[in-house]
Amino acid sequence: QAASIPDPYDASLLSADSIMKKVIFFAPFYESIIDDYRADLYIKGKVNLRKKNHILRFIPTMFRIRKGVREYMMETYSDLHFTAPDIYDQKVKASVGTTSEFWELDGRLPEYFHVNIYASTLLYDKLLSPLAPNAMKYYSYHVDSVMGKVHDLQYKISFKPKSKSFQLVSGHMVVSENVWSVREMHFSGRSEMLRFNNMIRMGDVGESDEFLPVHYDVDATFRFLGNVVDANYIAALDYKTIIQKDPSRMDRKRLKSKYDLSESYTLRSDTNAYKKDSSYFESIRPIPLTVHEQDLYKDFF
């Protein structure tokens, strides 16, 4: 009797660690493979003041709150230019909303949309990535499921910290066999005042944006002295040009730690970027508004 062939879709037969070793091995190549890109960046943000008291207006990152209004919404449409290793130049072409500026979470909102998923840290060096060279010391991994065609499998792998720490995150990722690149990653974490969930979807295998994010979804809850603020941000990127490095000139050295952000990120606005109504966005919005979001605009405009 012939030995039975192992089922490639049986997650219980797979070692998450052996898959992750390959993903972690390739991460430094993929981290620095992009030299330059230009993209249209759309961001939609919503904020709900679940609980508030008079202290809320002293939070430095908070926008101006209107009396009796708990929910706010804002959209922006920008040109984003990235130059390696980590210089981002964002020019806002159009913005509309029931407030004149985004709520910046912990003052670092742009970084939630500038994640290099293959870097050893996530979000401004605060968090150790489950793809870091030393990640296996701090994270445990598990194969949840196997998807796709037999010659083009994708593995859904969950990760969780081995010990409690604000520097570690939990969540899951989907990785592609053969190339060992990431299709999407969900990670959640917390600091003293902020809890967040971040979903990043990457381009497809073989496409020019394979190693770049195409969609972000960030949920955060901020708690401070009796105030509770919920926020949700969705971002979509549409790449116009992508320049990859010549692989023969790349080495496996990690990029140096992020330097002072004031040097690496600039945000400018067209003088007439702010729109007085939301109709302009109808033509450029990549993600339609929900009925509730339309109502927020109707009440405001």
Tell me the role of every PLM-derived stretch:
Residues 2-154, 162-168, 225-301:
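Structured extracytoplasmic
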Residues 149-154, 160-172, 176, 181-188:
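A conserved hydrophobic secondary-structure block that centers on an alpha-helix together
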Residues 171-173, 177, 198-209:
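Extended lipid/amphipathic-ligand handling interfaces
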Residues 185, 214-216:
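Beta-strand-dense domains in secreted/periplasmic systems and polymorphic toxin scaffolds
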Residues 189-191, 219-220:
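A short acidic/small-residue loop/turn micro-motif
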Residues 193, 207-208, 212, 222-224, ...:
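Extended non-globular scaffold/tether segments
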Residues 194-198, 229:
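A short, polar/charged loop-to-alpha-helix boundary motif
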